[in-house]
Amino acid sequence: MIFNAADAASWRRAGGLIYKPGPEQWAADLAGIAGGVTDLIVFGEGGPYNRAVLSQVEALAARVWVLENGYFRPDWITVERNGVNGSSGLPRFRGAYAAPALPPPVVQPVGRILPHHVANISLYHIAEALGAAAFPNFVVHYPHSPLKQCIGHVRRYLGLAFRPRRTRDAEQIAARGPFFIVCLQREGDMQLLRYSQYADNSAFMAATLDSFARHAPGDCRLVVKNHPLDPGVVSLRRITRWLAMERGVADRVDFIDGGHLNELCRASRGMVVNNSSAALSALGFHTPVKVLGDAFFDFEGLTDQKPLDRFWSEPTPPDEALFHRFRAHVIAASQINGNYHEPRTQPLAAEGLADMFERADG
């Protein structure tokens, strides 16, 4: 389906169906369009077009698949039936993962994907903006315009390239005292909008800092890590600094852009997330995790189930054996080795997806 100029520029084969009516008409036309295909595939759960598909899952004759970035990154992508993340069909209790772990799959590392990801996102937004007149009924579901996001991505990526690495090194941070890490998500991320009591990163940070200021040990610091793909339209660094000052803990709170997540997980006392999949990396390093939103991995044995106020002084690490069984099950059920943006591993991802669809036919 081609809904905008960026879709048209990206689709280089015959057979693309150009659709120019708005999302309300799309919802009405969907059943007829889906009647001629076996499978409908959407990327993510955001936007009125994808939401129309997901709201009609039970009524559609075609199977519905949802693609998303990998739960275990960077070497995997996610594909599930009917929903991902908070709508995932994966079990949410430890008893479902009691069976011995499956043998680990052979994985082809995807390498460094951030430059490719930023370039693809930026080019897509540019094409969408330049061709907007040709698709007047297309509705952008992002909280900020595509052009603003494009400029923000490029500016932020260039800034990271020239910023001293030492300000983001786990060793440098740990030398200042024990710390907890908070992982932010992209502004406007569907996980924030659909699967959280907090409307945005600012509300999530306010609640986290309220608890940290009142209940964390006085020698502990809080390291707030920005999402690597946040477009930088909202200055989360400035907001974090203001929230910390307002609560009297500015001298114990650091904001970092970039940094090696694995090293930070190893060095930290624990991680707090809204529902970011960064938590899965932390769990793999036996790092205690507290989830404040709705996540398929938030259950007893994996994440800390105590209130946040107690987490600061009594962080509980995951059951290591349970995590290995959980990871093996999730990879077998929903993960495909490869990447959407790294050119060398795109064919690998495509082959894996085709194989999963064929297995579903069997």
Stretch-by-stretch model annotation:
Residues D39-L54, D257-T303:
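A donor-sugar binding/catalytic signature common to diverse glycosyltransferases
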